Amino acid sequence: MLSVIFDSFPAFSADAPRAVVLLCDAASGETFAALDKASAGAVSRAVALKGFKGEAGQSVVLPAPAEGLSQVVLAGVKPKGGAAVDAVAIENAAGRAVRLLEGVESAVLALSEGLEQFAPDAALGARLASYDFDVYRTKKSESRPVLKTLHVAVSDVAAAQTRWAALDAVSQGVILTRNLVSEPPNVLYPQTFTQRIEELRELGLTVEVLDEKAMTELGFGALLGVAQGSVHKPRTVIVRHNGGGSEAPLAFIGKGVTFDSGGISIKPAAGMDEMKTDMGGAATVIGLMSALARRKALVNAIGVVGLVENMVSGGAQRPGDIVRAYDGQTIEVLNTDAEGRLVLADVLSYTRKRFSPKLMVNLATLTGAIVVSLGYENAGLFSNSDALAKGLSEAGAQVGEGLWRMPMGEAYNRELNSDIADMKNIGGRPGSAILAAEFLKRFVGDTDWAHLDIAGTAWKTKASAIAPKGATGFGVRLLDCFVKAHEASA
């Protein structure tokens, strides 16, 4: 993880060769002039040649332009269309810029006049962009250094450090989520995922584990039906952060299918390797709880994750089975690859009954249909509460994690009615992301609830400004921002 140090020293001192990143909204100002002077005019010449105007997406890279400067990267931050520079624009610019650095372990980042208040946001973008899941690479090149330390030049170190503390916490939550999603399924399965969660007790979180026996006694028939085909036994893990006195908790629920073969309704071989990511909702919840604990959030929050592996075997659940959920409702299982909703059915109803939360937000890589609807830029938002949906959407916009609210209603809900049980776990293909949400809604009662379908945003095959290809950690920052509005001091 990239180490961030806020320093008040001049960014362009020539005491040692230094790589410098400058985030700017114009090719002018005192900071730009100081860098140009240190480079003996090389910066201004390059800017003129490239037509750099400080616009978002623009960059200039100069290798060793002068003594004392090993590299210079200029990155524009000014949004197109005349919009004001904001934290998201700074994060994205910093993320792009640090990726342009070549072969350095340490760099200085500075911001042009009027942008210094965004220095912690720049550090966040740089840290998230520099993430690399390299745990299993045995041949790591020693000839190509990787950026390890970023010195961020500011005039008020104390103010920057104060604001960075919360961003540091959430960045570690995002990285934890990315790490969990990236792990191979032979390493991360319900028992080992549980062990990773239990390590968070050292942050002050309370962790409770329900094993197969406990869930059987409680009547988690829907979740246990999914798990019965695997040699890896299921777990439900409850993580609590108590920072809000006697207030009712906010509850966050995650789907944790550590590998999804589809069960007897088996998936095609192509792309099945990515089904290790089907625990992305649970990973996001755990990353969030880590962030709340690290920044000592003034709120009561509960994270509940249902952890299973959906496999094919002689003991696997069959299409046509009927299972009884925790709350007593019966479900006709017509497709064993629609398993995430079965896991969430028990976890949602259990959380509602046991903890009486103020609200519930569940996250799941639930449907391929949401990817068809929204692509890879926005997660689907379904809710029974306009106020909750609005709060989540505003939080997402603030941190650059987009949500798009989808319709719900009785016309969709009745498609789930079964002839021989209370409901079936699938309807027709049209609107199937909505039908999945309607299924979940049957288990939340009158509690304010939202479902985030993150199937298109939890894992990407192309890099973004602040995330390499692979696990994104989508949702941790969004929910952390959402929680802030509910804290005691808010």
Swiss-Prot record:
EC numbers: 3.4.11.1, 3.4.11.10
Catalyses which reaction(s): Release of an N-terminal amino acid, Xaa-|-Yaa-, in which Xaa is preferably Leu, but may be other amino acids including Pro although not Arg or Lys, and Yaa may be Pro. Amino acid amides and methyl esters are also readily hydrolyzed, but rates on arylamides are exceedingly low; Release of an N-terminal amino acid, preferentially leucine, but not glutamic or aspartic acids
Cofactor: Mn(2+)
GO biological process, one term: proteolysis
An example Gene Ontology molecular-function term: metalloaminopeptidase activity
Record's keyword annotation contains Nucleotide-binding: no
Record: active site: 267, 341
Residues that, per the record, bind Mn(2+) 1: 260, 337, 339
Enzyme class: hydrolase
Entry binding sites for Mn(2+) 2: 255, 260, 278, 339
Cofactor, how bound (note): Binds 2 manganese ions per subunit.
Assigned GO CC terms: cytoplasm
Pfam families: Peptidase_M17, Peptidase_M17_N
Entry-linked InterPro entries: Leucine_aapep/pepB, Macro_dom-like, Peptidase_M17_C, Peptidase_M17_leu_NH2_pept, Peptidase_M17_N
Alphabetized UniProt keyword annotations: Aminopeptidase, Cytoplasm, Hydrolase, Manganese, Metal-binding, Protease
Matching SUPFAM superfamilies: Macro domain-like (SSF52949), Zn-dependent exopeptidases (SSF53187)
Location of this chain's protein in the cell: Cytoplasm
Keyword Cytoplasm annotated: yes
Chief location bin: cytoplasm
Function text: Presumably involved in the processing and regular turnover of intracellular proteins. Catalyzes the removal of unsubstituted N-terminal amino acids from various peptides.
PANTHER family documented for this protein: CYTOSOL AMINOPEPTIDASE, LEUCINE AMINOPEPTIDASE-RELATED
HAMAP family in alphabetical order: Cytosol_peptidase_M17
Family to which the UniProt record says this protein belongs: Belongs to the peptidase M17 family.
Stated name of the protein: Probable cytosol aminopeptidase
Organism from which the protein derives: Gluconobacter oxydans (strain 621H)
